[in-house]
Amino acid sequence: MADFVKLSIFGTVFEVTTRYVDLQPVGMGAFGLVCSAKDQLSGTSVAIKKIMKPFSTPVLSKRTYRELKLLKHLRHENIISLSDIFISPLEDIYFVTELLGTDLHRLLTSRPLEKQFIQYFLYQILRGLKYVHSAGVVHRDLKPSNILVNENCDLKICDFGLARIQDPQMTGYVSTRYYRAPEIMLTWQKYDVAVDIWSTGCIFAEMLEGKPLFPGKDHVNQFSIITELLGTPPDDVIQTIASENTLRFVQSLPKREKVPFSTKFPNADPVSLDLLEKMLVFDPRTRISAAEGLAHEYLAPYHDPTDEPVAAEVFDWSFNDADLPVDTWKVMMYSEILDFHNLGDISQNEAEGPVTGEVPAAPAS
């Protein structure tokens, strides 16, 4: 049985094994507090995320189980990797991952990004998404604060708590509003990996401009702002709207023409705008894919088709429709944690090569 140390951080009790020292708060999310720490076993800095009361409801239990399963399954250079997981005596769950130092949101609020860094960050986002999407997973909540970056400009996508199966009948209210794809707002269903490409397009535009592209005050305003740039949605897109109320709202909006991206982004490289326009398309069926985005001329300095891998296996979503009591989720969680530790030391696993792909060198400052 591991020894635990109890600390109070931001008024929140943190119970961690004695392996981790020098805890410092770095962020607070909707579902947990994140601290940096020193891992005495590996000598590296790590991030420890406390999942608050994971067994308080079946919904929270399932959400935590889903995130754990995904972190175990997704092994790629541009996806945050799990190095340890434990349940404390108070039955809180702690995920331990690598620490990257900052995120894209903080970078964007501190200074404008130069072209080569925008290219490199966008390349890594799409490289990670190509892998994630090939595993049958949709992130659903991509935004600058979920994209971690270190001092070498290595980028990793994190926070898979809302991720879901790629399913044409997906439902739900997800993603921070500014980055939310129109099909989520219009139909509440029938969306797939293309929602992540829309979010990436919004992030790309924000890197180019230094400010959010579609800063909606609410759901209605958000959609209205999108139409100010992209124009009125095509009829075939409007016909896919499932909700009568939403359909009436869209039909009530004034007819708008698309604004040329060169007008909206007068200082941007035309090649970058060509890629951006292919991402910010109303119809998800014609939106560019992650793999197609990687092959675009704008990312030519980094594109390497031999080193942009896909997942070896599609993620097993069989648990996702299960409506189980907390105690059952708890047993399943313990089983997954035991399995994780039985795989042996994570660094040994990495030495043997389970993490897919090597990221190219960062641009020179």
From Swiss-Prot:
The record places the active site at 141
**Which cofactors is this protein said to need?**
Mg(2+)
Q: Where in the cell is it found?
A: Cytoplasm; Nucleus
State the coiled-coil residue ranges.
Answer: none
Q: What is the effect of changing residue 49 to S?
A: Confers resistance to fludioxonil
Q: Which residues are modified to Phosphotyrosine?
A: 173
SMART domains noted in UniProt? S_TKc
Gene3D superfamilies assigned to the protein according to its UniProt record, in alphabetical order: Phosphorylase Kinase, domain 1, Transferase(Phosphotransferase) domain 1
Q: Name one GO molecular function term.
A: MAP kinase activity
- In this chain, ATP is annotated as bound at 26-34, 49
Q: Which residues carry this modification: Phosphothreonine?
A: 171
The reply on keyword Cytoplasm is yes
Reading the lineage from the top rank, the first entry is Eukaryota
Reaction catalyzed: L-seryl-[protein] + ATP = O-phospho-L-seryl-[protein] + ADP + H(+); L-threonyl-[protein] + ATP = O-phospho-L-threonyl-[protein] + ADP + H(+)
Which Gene Ontology BP terms does the record give? stress-activated MAPK cascade
Q: Which UniProt keywords apply?
A: Activator, ATP-binding, Cytoplasm, Kinase, Nucleotide-binding, Nucleus, Phosphoprotein, Serine/threonine-protein kinase, Transcription, Transcription regulation, Transferase
Note the PANTHER family from the entry.
MITOGEN-ACTIVATED PROTEIN KINASE
Q: Which family does it belong to?
A: Belongs to the protein kinase superfamily. Ser/Thr protein kinase family. MAP kinase subfamily. HOG1 sub-subfamily.
* Purpose of the protein: Proline-directed serine/threonine-protein kinase involved in a signal transduction pathway that is activated by changes in the osmolarity of the extracellular environment. Controls osmotic regulation of transcription of target genes. Also involved in the response to UV radiation, heat stress and oxidative stress. Mediates the sensitivity to fludioxonil, an agricultural fungicide.
This protein's name: Mitogen-activated protein kinase HOG1
Native source organism of the sequence: Cryptococcus neoformans var. grubii serotype A (strain H99 / ATCC 208821 / CBS 10515 / FGSC 9487)
